[in-house]
Amino acid sequence: MERRVEVGELLPGEGALSVAADIYLPLRMRSPPTALFCLPGGALTRGYYDLQPDPAPEPARSAADFSFARSLAARGFIVVTLDPLGVGGSSRPRDGFELTPDVLTKANAAAVDSICSDLRAGGVAGGGPPLEELRTIGVGHSMGAMLTAMHQARECRHAGLMLFGYSTRGLAPALSPEEAAFSDDPAGTRQNVVRLARARSREPYPEINSSQGRGLFAGKGADRRGVEALQSARAELLITAGLFSMIPGSSAPECVRLDIPIFLAVGDQDIAGPPHEIPASFPAAPDVTLLVLPATGHCHFLFASRRHLFARASDWLETVVT
């Protein structure tokens, strides 16, 4: 079920902006009803959460093979996938350099609040039952995990977070000397990130070429069918937010404040740094679960370990929301 959610006038001269979403409703709703709000990583659309090989697999139930959304919906959870502003079906401002993480977070928060209100009132599925006891979980991959953490630190909406392929380490080797000078200086990064993004790229929505993308997103051991399905979920990069996520420590203050259970999943061939160092970034969280996926790169859903990930995610959710 596709939705477009108005999120208001967030940038001068752009008018009202909207966020695109897909809502996957379970055939049998678990109790209490729980919605997962999922944000994709950089250079990906919300389609990352519902990868479908071409031609369509048979039998129909195997359509969930690479699909986080369908797998978790089959386990009784509502899954909502969102395109950040500038990506996929969401509004694309003319000056994409102004899409800072703070602007994106405001838009995401507005979209989540709107959809939650509809779910609680029973207005999503054409007269479905009101879900007054709805619980929510924030889910994000890579840059989307950063935005999910920032949303929770700002709004405190969710009962827990699931963060995939994410740490506060950034990608220091990919930075220029001027960009690297802001490492572990989140205030300075915020003040300068738009200027740095304009210096780094002439385009606010640059494309990642196919060979570079395959190396970053897939890598050794990725299932060919998943790699091919991922092509339909590829998008241009949001350069400002992408650069922000690459600068070490940029989102550390938000992570320090998170005081809810957190599920971390990283591949042993991921780009998030040493996995067992990541939980230390969440000192206020009462429970931090770390799952290290074997023989797995950055886009976890492309690898054989995805089935274990989907099952562990479901088990963790049961402990958090019951």
Protein language model regions, located:
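N-terminal cap/lid segment of alpha/beta-hydrolase-fold proteins
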Residues: 1-31
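Short, surface-exposed "cap/lid" segments of acyl-processing enzymes
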Residues: 29-80
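Alpha/beta-hydrolase
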Residues: 176-269
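Conserved hydrolase catalytic core segment
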Residues: 132-171
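Alpha/beta-hydrolase active-site loop
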Residues: 98-130
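Catalytic histidine-centered segment of alpha/beta-hydrolase-like enzymes
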Residues: 296-307
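Glycine-rich "HGGG/HGxG" loop immediately N-terminal to the catalytic nucleophile
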Residues: 47, 70, 84-99, 298-299
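Conserved loop-alpha-helix segment in the C-terminal half of the alpha/beta-hydrolase fold
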Residues: 266-296
